[in-house]
């Protein structure tokens, strides 16, 4: 298991046979900056060579609020295209990971953070989890595959409502609509049980 460097935008540790990748930032909001996206791609490429069940999680109040808008608006057109490709590369690395991947989500899961959660094979969330994609309200639309993945999970009409109207939804509606697999008081512990069970059955 590759160690996370000091000051890295995430930590990586093991609980038994399960790897836990925890997004970290000083403000706890876990923005998906270009540097963070590249670091996540690198670590996923490393652990794919000897895959074990993986949980991706964040802080108590934020899974991730998505891209850093200040960084986004400063991008040139070529740089924006490159960032879009990097985001797609990250989501594909998660979706194609050869062992079970579960997002353990507390609090806000927004924008690119929602894209990341959608790329995971399973999603277990706290009762206070909130989901949304506010890009359309800011004149932006995700280029990271979230539109397609969300449509497959909850249907085109509901996905359009979330993306075009920038509508936020809570944990219970997310469960009823099929966006998430389970609501739990302790998403991390529930995720540990789930990926262990799925890995045993694989």
Predicted regions and their residues:
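Structural motif
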Residues: 57, 104-105, 134
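Hydrophobic/aromatic residues within transmembrane alpha-helices
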Residues: 56, 68, 116-117, 174
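Catalytic cores of nucleotide-enabled group-transfer and carboxylate-activating enzymes in metabolic
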Residues: 7, 16-19, 27, 83, ...
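Conserved CoA-thioester-binding segment of acyl-CoA-metabolizing enzymes
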Residues: 1-57, 92
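A short, small-residue-rich loop immediately preceding and capping a beta-strand
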Residues: 98-108
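C-terminal long alpha-helix characteristic of the crotonase
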Residues: 124-129, 171, 176-202
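Glycine- (often His-adjacent) and acidic-residue-rich active-site loop
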Residues: 50, 58-90, 109, 137-139
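CoA-thioester-processing core
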Residues: 90, 110-163, 191
């Amino acid at each position: 298991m590759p160690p996370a460097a000091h000051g890295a935008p995430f930590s990586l540790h093991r609980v038994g046979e399960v790897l836990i990748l925890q997004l970290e930032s000083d403000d706890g909001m876990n923005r998906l900056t270009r540097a963070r996206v590249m670091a996540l791609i690198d670590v996923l490429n490393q652990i794919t060579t000897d895959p074990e069940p993986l949980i991706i999680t964040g802080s108590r109040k934020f899974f991730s609020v998505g891209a850093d808008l200040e960084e986004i608006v400063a991008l040139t057109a070529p740089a924006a295209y490159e960032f879009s490709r990097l985001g797609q590369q990250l989501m594909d690395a998660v979706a194609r990971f050869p062992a079970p991947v579960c997002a353990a989500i507390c609090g806000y899961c927004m924008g690119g953070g929602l894209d990341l959660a959608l790329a995971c094979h399973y999603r277990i969330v706290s009762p206070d989890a909130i989901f949304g994609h506010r890009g359309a309200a800011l004149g932006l639309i995700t280029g990271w595959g979230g539109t397609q993945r969300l449509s497959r999970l909850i249907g085109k009409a509901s996905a359009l409502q979330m993306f075009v109207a920038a509508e936020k939804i809570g944990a219970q509606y997310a469960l009823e609509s099929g966006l998430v697999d389970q609501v739990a008081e302790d998403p991390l512990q529930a995720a540990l049980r789930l990926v262990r069970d799925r890995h045993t059955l694989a």
